[in-house]
C-alpha cells in the first residue's frame, strides 16, 4: 500500500511520549477515535450535521469518521487514537481498528518506521497515542506521541520476550465456566456440563467437534458469557470466519468482548488477513503476561481459506486439500499455550463434520490430535431437541488432574463410570435432570457419596 505521508520531526517521539493524553488537552477538546468508531451510523450523521459536513449521505462509515475528525481538528480539537498495528513490507505501518474488523480504510493511523524502531513495535501491538490530521498532500492521520503499548507503559514493549521464545506448559489454572442457575426457568446447563466432562484451563487448545445444526454457535455464546462473567481479567476475542451476517450481529450484541468477523461474501484472502491480525494481537498481549481467549467459528472454514490462498505445491491430498495448506492454520491453532511465569493464550475452535464435504473431513482428521481438550456434539441428541447436544463419553480434557481438585476429580470419574453404559442421548438426559435440581456443580457433587480413587482412571 502506497502512502504520501512523510517522516517529519513531529512524528518522532520525544521524551514526553509517555505522558498521559490528559496532559495535552489544554488547547482544545479531546476526541477519542475509538469511541467515535463505536457510534452508530445515525449518531455519526447527526454529529456530522452539527459540524456542517456536506454530502454525508454518500459517505461510508469510515469516510464519515474521517470527515468528522478532520473538521474537529480545524476547530481546535485534539485526537487520541488507538488501534492494532499492521507493519507493511516497506517498514511503515498503520493502526487498524477492530470496530471495522481490521479492514484498511481512510481513518487508519500512519506510524513512521522511526517510531516502529524506537519502541520495538511489531504487527499485533495495540498502540494508543495522540494523532494529527493529514497535512497538504497526505492521505492519513499520523501518530504524534505513543502513550501506551498493549495497555502498558511503552518502555515495557522494548524489553519483552518474543512469543516463540516463551516456555509452553500444560494448563494448570482453571478457566471458570460455571454459571449458577438462579431460577427454575433457567434451561441453559451447557457451561456446567462442560465443567463436568471437559474442564477448561488457561492455555487450553480445545476443539468443539460439531455436525451442522447442533447448536455450536449458541454454545460458543454461552462459553463467551461465562468467560466474561467469571474471568474479568481475561481479554476475550471472538473470531467469526466465513459466517452469515445476521449471526455476526447476534454475536456482537450478546457477547461482552471483541467480536471481529469476515462474512461468507468476502474473499478467502480477507479471512486469512483477519485471522493473522487476531493471532498476532493475542501473541503481543501474551508477551505482556496477559491471559487471552480466542473463540473461533470455525477452524474448518479458516483452513478452507488458507487452502484457497496458499501457492500450489503440486501435491493435492484427498478432498482437494493442498499438501502445504494446513501448515498455517495449524500454526494458528498451535499458538494456544500456557506460559511459564505468567500469561496464556486459550483457543476454543469449532471443527465441522458430517457436512458432506470430503475436504472438511480431511481438515478435521488433520486437527483431531492437535488439541488437548475436545467437546463432541451429537446430531442425534440435537434432533431430539436436547441441548447442549454434548456426547459426554467422547468429550474430555487431557491432564485434567492439573485443573481439578482430587476429591472433585474422583467424583467426576465415578460420574463417567455411571454414564458409560448408557447411550449418548440417555447420558446427557440423565445428567441434565440431575443438574436441574441443583444451582451449582458443587451442590451436585454434594449429592454424590465420596468415592475412593479408581485404580484404572476412567
Swiss-Prot record:
Q: So what EC number does this one have?
A: 3.6.4.-
Return any one Pfam family short name: Rho_N
According to the UniProt entry, the coiled-coil residues are none
Residues binding ATP, per UniProt: 201-206, 213-218, 244
- InterPro entries associated with the record: AAA+_ATPase, ATPase_F1/V1/A1_a/bsu_nucl-bd, CSD, NA-bd_OB-fold, P-loop_NTPase, Rho-like_N, Rho_factor_ATP-bd, Rho_N_sf
| Biological process annotations from GO | DNA-templated transcription termination
Provide one Gene Ontology cellular component: cytosol
Query: Entry's CDD domains?
Result: Rho_CSD (cd04459), rho_factor_C (cd01128)
Q: Name one GO molecular function term.
A: RNA binding
Enzyme class, top EC level, equals: hydrolase
User: Residue limits of the Rho RNA-BD domain?
Assistant: 78-153
Q: Where is this region: Disordered?
A: 1-26
SMART domains to which the protein is assigned, alphabetical: AAA (SM00382), CSP (SM00357), Rho_N (SM00959)
Assembly and partners?
Answer: Homohexamer. The homohexamer assembles into an open ring structure.
Question: Which family does the entry's similarity section mention?
Answer: Belongs to the Rho family.
**Name of this protein:** Transcription termination factor Rho
Name the source organism: Rickettsia felis (strain ATCC VR-1525 / URRWXCal2)
